């Protein structure tokens, strides 16, 4: 079984784990996942080559997005942001299977905002 990984260069796993944010349409058919990588290995000075996409690879195969943007601070690359979009429930379910495998492979958790009216704050804070 192949370990779930993200690659900016085919065959080279990106070691930096991104922050991932999901948005979906009200009908649930379309949506996108935004990946933000802070100081990824793919933009290290010693890395050669152009980044032409982000591949999400697991035991089912691969998904790819070409929507990649670099973030720069004082003229130096500091982050990468990639957006993966889906246009069907099947595509979303496939993405979520990858996300679950990727989370397990990297010791990550998953949290979901159940109520858009929630306010930020610590629910366990003492008065």
Curated annotation (Swiss-Prot):
The primary location reported for this protein is membrane
Membrane topology value: Peripheral membrane protein
Q: Which InterPro entries does this one have?
A: Psb28_c1_sf (IPR038676), PSII_Psb28_class-1 (IPR005610)
Write out the entry's keywords from A to Z: Membrane, Photosynthesis, Photosystem II, Thylakoid
What Gene3D superfamilies does the database record attribute to this sequence? Answer: Photosystem II Psb28
What HAMAP family has UniProt attached to this entry? Answer: PSII_Psb28
Identification of the protein by name:
Photosystem II reaction center Psb28 protein
Species: Parasynechococcus marenigrum (strain WH8102)
Origin organism lineage: Bacteria, Bacillati, Cyanobacteriota, Cyanophyceae, Synechococcales
């Amino acid at each position: 079984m192949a370990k779930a990984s993200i690659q900016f260069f085919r065959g080279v796993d990106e070691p930096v784990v991104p922050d991932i944010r999901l948005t979906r349409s009200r009908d649930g058919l379309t949506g996108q996942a935004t990946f933000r990588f802070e100081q990824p290995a793919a933009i290290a000075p010693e890395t050669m080559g152009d980044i032409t996409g982000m591949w999400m690879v697991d035991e089912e195969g691969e998904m790819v997005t070409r929507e990649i943007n670099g973030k720069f601070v004082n003229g130096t690359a500091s982050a990468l942001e990639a957006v993966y979009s889906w246009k069907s429930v099947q595509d979303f379910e496939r993405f979520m299977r990858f996300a679950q495998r990727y989370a397990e492979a990297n010791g990550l958790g998953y949290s979901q905002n159940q109520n858009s009216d929630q306010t930020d704050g610590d629910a366990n804070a003492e008065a």
